[in-house]
């Protein structure tokens, strides 16, 4: 195969890859698929990306390299034809509190440029356009009057350099000026000087120097004369010039012009792009320094339940015997100010909220209450109370816009930059489509608008039209931040690169998958090679080339079981992917759904975009919450349902999302657990066997061996986390890290224990011929076989759940940091399965199918059934239709994302939801249930 058409990998041995060789076609859309743990990421990220990135970094100088991540060479014979690689992962990339969707997609940078170039400044006093005038504007003013209209050209008289008015007039007269206008009356300068000598200088007088007297005419001579006079007037009047027109009926009209950027007596800043940057001291609000929030009294802590009225005790700090005096006083004063004391807080107008918070001076209001607390801070109870209500609160100066107030005076199309970043992206697109500009502005903004419109379209294409540009990057989900990175990559339109994406379909509803495929195609059509690690059937079918790694996971994977396109699929393959794609293996929905009578109901949920909905979560069944991206699934399940119940069952300090009440059979459940995909442990010492508490039993077993007893070794002696039996050279890690300045850190096997983590005498203690190190090297499947054979039922019982959730291929001592997100979540699931929890518990999962192959999903559903059979309840946020069709109860939110979402569209069995015409989930379920 010719080098230019393929990226050739020969003998890849990273992690569990078994010396594989593969040719990836360049300039195509390639999907790498396979079971969870089969080696997809090892091939795509640890081999392809690592090498593409390393070669690019190697081409830089050693000075530049020290600022970049140092990269080691992947274990591989050779890789040919690899372009520079860019990885777009699921990680929420930005922890920076200043980073927003607008800044990370670069749309905000272009908006700043747009406002700096064509923004119009309006005076906050009169609303008039602030403009710098030139002589042309003055000529234009004359041309609008009928020919023959008399007018004068005037300049305001400013005594300069500390002179008196009389001295200034004297100098002007010597320079050849003859007349002034005083209080609309024209006088000769010498007459006015005599008047001043007689009466003394007035404190304030409107005195203008008369520069010229003319009649309006459109001929060239008049225009030239007026231009000269106007320039003289502006020079004499310190940038200001007036024209006074006299009409036939004796009335006059005065027009003011200025070369300064001012109006209504205020001098404005001329727009620059720095003026709109909240990361620059020039543009950032001085109070919050561009964060938009300050530490102050947090509205959400003072009024946690916005569904209550003031009368019902919405203001928490006014509860209790002593503080309720404030409430009584407020209720007494309220009728006089037309304040509705029985209206729920969320229904109050802004004016009414302002009265409650800021009130009239010296009256009972929330501000004056906290002022009293601050004045009495020397008493500890007041200090404690103040601390309880302090939190991040919107900056009172900029109201969360992050910019100085001057930036708000500049508008494009009648809107300020702060108003634009608050619009959802689909509304922003409509704004720019309808933006009317004059010829000059349109020419200036043409290129900028192209860039903005393209990037907005890319965000729409990846299904993120519901986000706003000022949404903080660190508040996005993994799938959202990955798709933002994808849109940014499209925006930067690089060519000839290798893009490697990790499951871009995460968090995407089936409705948006087509659009995602289109985006991936666009990226490929620019001339890039796009490699996607993916399990989504539609994306696999849309690929130009499929690489399937397997046949199973871990040690039983790491081989290429299929490579080619969709047309060449052969029945009877040993590839699970091929068998699912050909319909030889399927996930069969249950014959009947479990009936239910008991439930917990969330009433009036209105956190974020939820529209005050009532939702029932049935108990002891599997409920799946669906809906398009941004429809409010995570808000409902995690922020409202989970946090509110957690508060019921334990002293949880986290504030639940806004809702009226929780009703139903709350007491039938004893606890609620949220199982996410975060790593089970960040350290290299944490591993699955310690997480499911099986290692404790294994250590006890070794401590009971005759040699251990003889030498006095306790169970703690067999731990690699505490001093004793572990190798002290590497502190039980098995490896030693040597720091190198310009190259990747070298991780070397420990010379003392040769990677075995324990001292030699510890390893002499054996059980059935196996040392503790040998046990840690076994996979879960091997260990279960070994311990079953030797009648160690306690250990087997702890390990069995790992096998049940499909992690039989993982080594007992494998570091958690090498596990994928899907694997982490399943280790947690195994932990819950291993606990003999008899108390009924609700388990909440957020997209548990992330990183899971069709075959793994089957096992996951079996694990869920096992939990339900023990009396537990499962609630899942999920898009995967194979999981949705197996649910007992489906809750569909929508119909769209963002502001157009947050409603309960349908609820019932999958078959009932499939009948719902307005539900997108229903439309796709219908196909799946056929």
Predicted regions and their residues:
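Conserved phosphate-binding elements of NTP-dependent enzyme cores
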Residues: 1-930
């Amino acid at each position: 195969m010719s080098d230019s058409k393929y990226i050739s990998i020969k003998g890849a041995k990273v992690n569990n890859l078994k010396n594989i060789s593969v040719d990836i076609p360049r300039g195509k859309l390639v999907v790498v698929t396979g079971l969870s743990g089969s080696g997809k990421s090892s091939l795509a990220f640890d081999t392809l990306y690592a090498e593409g990135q390393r070669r690019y970094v190697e081409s830089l100088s050693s000075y530049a390299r020290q600022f970049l991540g140092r990269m080691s060479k992947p274990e591989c014979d050779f890789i040919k034809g690899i372009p520079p690689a860019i990885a777009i992962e699921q990680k929420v990339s930005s922890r920076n509190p200043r980073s927003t969707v607008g800044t990370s997609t670069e749309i905000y940078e272009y908006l700043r440029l747009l406002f700096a170039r064509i923004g119009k400044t309006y005076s906050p006093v009169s609303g008039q356009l602030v403009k710098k005038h030139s002589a042309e504007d003055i000529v234009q003013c004359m041309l609008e009057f009928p020919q023959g209209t008399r007018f004068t050209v005037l300049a305001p008289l400013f005594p300069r350099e500390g002179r008196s008015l009389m001295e200034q007039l004297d100098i002007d007269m010597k320079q050849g000026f003859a007349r002034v206008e005083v209080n609309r009356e024209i006088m000769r300068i010498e007459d006015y000087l005599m008047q001043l000598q007689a009466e003394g200088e007035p404190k304030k007088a409107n005195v203008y120097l008369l520069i010229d007297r003319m009649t309006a005419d459109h001929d060239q001579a008049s225009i030239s004369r007026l231009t000269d006079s106007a320039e003289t007037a502006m020079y004499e009047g310190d940038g200001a010039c007036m024209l006074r027109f006299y009409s036939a009926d004796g009335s006059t009209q005065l027009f003011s012009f200025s070369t300064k950027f001012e109006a209504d007596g205020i001098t404005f800043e001329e727009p620059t792009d720095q003026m709109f940057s909240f990361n620059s001291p020039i543009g950032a609000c001085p109070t919050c320094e561009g964060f938009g929030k300050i530490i102050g009294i947090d509205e959400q802590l003072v009024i946690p339940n916005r569904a209550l009225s003031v009368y019902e005790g919405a203001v928490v700090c006014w509860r209790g015997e002593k503080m309720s005096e404030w409430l009584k006083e407020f209720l007494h004063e309220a009728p006089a100010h037309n304040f509705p004391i029985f209206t729920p807080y969320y229904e109050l107008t802004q004016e009414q909220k302002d009265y409650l918070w800021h009130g009239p001076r010296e009256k009972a209001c929330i501000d004056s209450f906290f002022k009293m607390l601050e004045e009495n801070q020397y008493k500890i109870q007041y200090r404690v109370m103040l601390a309880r209500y302090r939190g991040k609160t919107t900056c009172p100066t900029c109201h969360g816009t992050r910019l100085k107030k001057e930036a708000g005076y500049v508008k494009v199309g009648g809107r300020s930059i702060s108003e634009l970043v608050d619009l959802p992206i689909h509304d922003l697109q409509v704004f720019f489509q309808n933006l009317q500009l004059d010829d000059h502005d349109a020419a200036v903004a043409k290129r900028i608008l192209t860039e903005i419109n393209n990037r907005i379209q890319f965000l729409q294409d990846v299904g993120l039209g519901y986000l706003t540009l000022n949404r903080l990057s660190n508040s996005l989900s993994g799938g959202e931040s990955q798709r933002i990175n994808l849109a940014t990559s499209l925006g930067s339109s690089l060519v000839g690169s290798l893009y490697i994406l990790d499951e871009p379909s995460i968090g995407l509803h089936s409705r948006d998958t087509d659009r995602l495929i289109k985006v991936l195609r666009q990226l490929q059509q620019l001339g890039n090679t796009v490699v996607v690690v993916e399990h989504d059937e539609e994306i696999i079918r849309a690929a130009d080339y499929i690489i399937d790694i397997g046949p199973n996971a871990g040690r039983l994977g790491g081989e290429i079981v299929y490579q080619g396109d969709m047309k060449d699929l052969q029945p009877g393959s040993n590839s699970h992917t091929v068998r699912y794609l050909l319909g030889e293996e399927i996930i069969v929905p249950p014959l009947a759904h479990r009936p239910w009578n008991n439930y917990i109901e969330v009433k009036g949920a209105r956190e974020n975009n939820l529209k005050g909905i009532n939702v029932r979560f049935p108990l002891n069944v599997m409920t799946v919450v669906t809906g398009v991206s941004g429809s409010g699934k995570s808000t409902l399940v995690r922020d409202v349902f989970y946090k509110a119940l957690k508060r019921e069952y334990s002293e949880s300090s986290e504030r639940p999302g806004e809702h009226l009440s929780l009703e139903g059979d709350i007491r039938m459940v004893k606890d609620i657990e949220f199982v996410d995909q975060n790593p089970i442990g960040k350290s290299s010492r944490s591993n699955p066997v310690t997480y499911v508490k099986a290692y404790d039993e294994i250590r006890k077993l070794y401590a009971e061996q005759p040699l251990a007893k003889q030498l006095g070794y306790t169970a703690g002696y067999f731990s690699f986390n505490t001093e004793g039996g572990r190798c002290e050279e590497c502190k039980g890690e098995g490896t030693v890290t040597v720091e190198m300045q310009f190259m990747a850190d070298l991780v070397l096997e420990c010379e003392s224990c040769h990677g075995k983590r324990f001292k030699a005498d510890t390893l002499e203690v054996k059980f059935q011929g196996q040392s503790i190190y040998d046990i840690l090297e076994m996979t879960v499947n091997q260990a279960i076989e070994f311990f079953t054979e030797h009648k160690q039922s306690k250990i087997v019982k702890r390990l069995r759940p790992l096998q049940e959730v499909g992690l039989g291929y993982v080594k007992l001592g494998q570091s958690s940091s090498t596990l994928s997100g899907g694997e982490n979540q399943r280790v947690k699931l195994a932990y819950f399965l291993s606990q003999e929890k008899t108390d009924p518990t609700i388990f909440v999962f957020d997209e548990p199918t992330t990183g899971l192959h069709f075959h793994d999903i089957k096992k996951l559903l079996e694990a869920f059934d096992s939990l339900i059979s023990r009396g537990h309840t499962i609630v899942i946020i999920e898009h995967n239709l194979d999981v949705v069709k197996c649910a007992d109860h489906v809750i569909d939110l929508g119909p769209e994302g963002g502001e157009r979402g947050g409603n309960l569209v349908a609820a019932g069995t999958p078959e009932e939801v499939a009948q719902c015409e307005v539900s997108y989930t229903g439309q796709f379920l219908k196909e799946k249930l056929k």
